Design a protein with these regions (language model features):
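PP2C/PPM-type serine/threonine phosphatase catalytic domain
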Residues: 1-273
Length: 273
């Protein structure tokens, strides 16, 4: 299939923080209708150079895809990218001995002839919406999510649990990592083969989620406003209600040639040996 995109809308703001630890690829105002790869990262911990971690991870993704000639990403490609990001972290830590660790979330969207590949680690999200409804959403890698699934706490309790912001997965390196020890980085990878004209993909860091829930997102994207106005509406809500950095990408699908009527989803969870 051939996927034609509207002009992508991106934003990244401080919120009520003193520095922005989110990073986007392409940077704000750099994407075009021809852009196929979108990356949203949220660095962890101000003292641990979260803004550097998110930038290094975005750069690892972009550099790999450009160097390899824009391959359709699969689990093997993603693992190479994560290994390179991990090594970039290790190098930075070695050059900055006052730091003990660094890490970032990852949300990745690649549009290609087979549809859309989505990869994520942590709690930065990717949504697919159609006709004003979310039809796909990544699952946050948070400790409370695992506790809910295990029946330890309820979904309601998770909302106020003291561990609600703790990640169960992230792209992370620490000075305590042993040299030569196998890298254990985990990514959820999904390929969506049902992409249709009028669909939206929305990617965001968790700061956006302080202001925007599923109902609000569906309502805004179902409106008759142009894409720029939709993006501005989401940003206005975040400006009013988000304490954290908030960043996102809104990608509208304008036309798809040879769209299949049925949705096929192939999910791979990749664990490094």
């Amino acid at each position: 299939m051939k996927i034609y995109r509207a002009f992508p809308m991106a934003f990244s703001h401080l919120g009520q923080r003193t520095n922005n630890q989110d990073y986007l690829y392409p940077n704000v105002d750099k994407a075009t209708e021809q852009t196929e790869l979108f990356v949203v990262c949220d660095g962890m911990g101000g003292a641990d150079k979260g803004e550097v971690a998110s930038k290094l991870l975005c750069e690892a993704v972009a550099d790999y895809v450009i160097t390899m000639g824009n391959p359709t990403l699969d689990a093997a490609h993603i693992q190479v990218i994560l290994n390179r990001a991990y090594e970039a972290y290790r190098t930075y830590l070695a050059q900055n001995p006052l730091l003990s660790r660094m890490g970032s979330t990852l949300a990745l969207l690649q549009l290609h002839q087979q549809g859309a590949t989505i990869c994520h680690i942590g709690d930065s999200r990717v949504y697919q919406l159609r006709a004003g409804q979310v039809i796909f959403q990544t699952k946050d890698h948070r400790q409370v999510e695992d506790m809910v699934e295990a029946g330890i706490i309820t979904a309601t309790q998770a909302l106020t649990h003291p561990w609600r912001n703790r990640l169960s997965r992230a792209v992370m390196a620490s000075v305590t990592d042993k040299e030569g020890e196998p890298v254990k980085l985990m990514a959820d990878i999904v390929t969506l083969t049902d992409v249709q004209a009028g669909d939206y993909f929305f990617m965001c860091t968790d700061g956006v989620l302080e202001a925007i829930d599923t109902y609000i997102l569906e309502t805004v994207l179902a409106s008759n406003m142009p894409d720029q106005a939709k993006s501005e509406s989401l940003q206005a809500l975040c400006s009013a209600h988000s304490k954290d950095n908030y960043s996102g990408y809104l990608i509208g699908i304008s036309y798809v040639a040879h769209t299949d009527s049925a949705q096929s989803i192939h999910t791979i969870t990749n664990y490094a040996d």
